[in-house]
Amino acid sequence: MDSSKVYFTDFRTPAYGDSVLKKLQKLIKRAGIAEMDLDGKFVAIKMHFGEHGNISFLRPNWARAVVDVVKELGGKPFLTDCNTMYPGYRKNAIEHLYCAWENGFTPLAVGCPVIIGDGLKGTDDVEVPVVGGEFVQKAKIGRAIMDADVIISLTHFKGHETTGFGGTIKNIGMGSGSRAGKKEQHSSGKATIIADLCRGCRKCRKECANNGLVFDEQSRKMTVNRDNCVGCGRCLGACNFDAIRFQNDGAVSDLNCKMAEYTKAVLDGRPSFHISLIVDVSPNCDCHQENDAPIIPDVGMLCSFDPLALDQACVDLCLKQTPIENSQLGDHMRAIGFIDRHDHFCNNNPESEYLSCLEHAEKIGLGSRRYELVKG
């Protein structure tokens, strides 16, 4: 596959010059965002609003800079993300919106609506065929994201405890999956009922098409018929009390490959453009209710029409940086018995790996790992 262009600029701004937000706008224009036909189109800007308590996510100002360019080109932008499969402040649309607003993503601040992609309970999804999929035949994608005419991803590039790093493919693939879609990527297992949390309301049973959930008259709790449960994850969104769990038992390589296939399902057949900011590179996901200190210095802003080339370029730039000594990565590198894997992300989270994601993404035609870095 031919190489793709990835555009890059750093965060330096001279006194009395353009702001760094203007610098981002100039970068995405130079990369060719204006070549996309956005006039009158619904444009989904896929990003992460940050978990409650976390402050390493991208500031709303970055989103506003992109929103203003989309509007200038005649588009109708909205910010979007889908609900999480685990307990927290983003597992349903009401709490998710409150969390986004608390973190500054209000319509007044960002200049457009914020729409939770998979609806109130995370069950409003569309099954999208994965062309060439080896792990997923039909991806479960939030309906609002699939209804959009154009996809723009805005990604905080950072470390991740499972996938090594969180980049464009994770933002789109995992982030656009409904609660059931996220479960499919994380696990091949069956539902488990946490009895102490179950209220016996039976709402979950209405969502199960396979008689996998049974009400136990003696305990007045729901139970799982493991012979019937197919692990679809639909029951996750039905429970308001976090009583249903799925163990994250999928191999990391399988998870990575599924993320790539979910990303392909989202992007196939639609115009898309992708932006990544290597800033506040925290060691773990922005899904945490806390964030540790950055593991490397800030690097810059990148964008491309190719999501895979963009992730590869971000990785390569990060690996050239000197680790910050007072960080999780620094701690690991000083630990007794440390084994150097010659990779910041693998040294940061030794149980993680990411090459399987990049390799599989290229195999299924998501993009190219070969790129030309255009600096400016």
Predicted regions and their residues:
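Extended, low-polarity segments enriched in aliphatic/aromatic residues
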Residues: 2-54, 58-62, 69, 73-81, ...
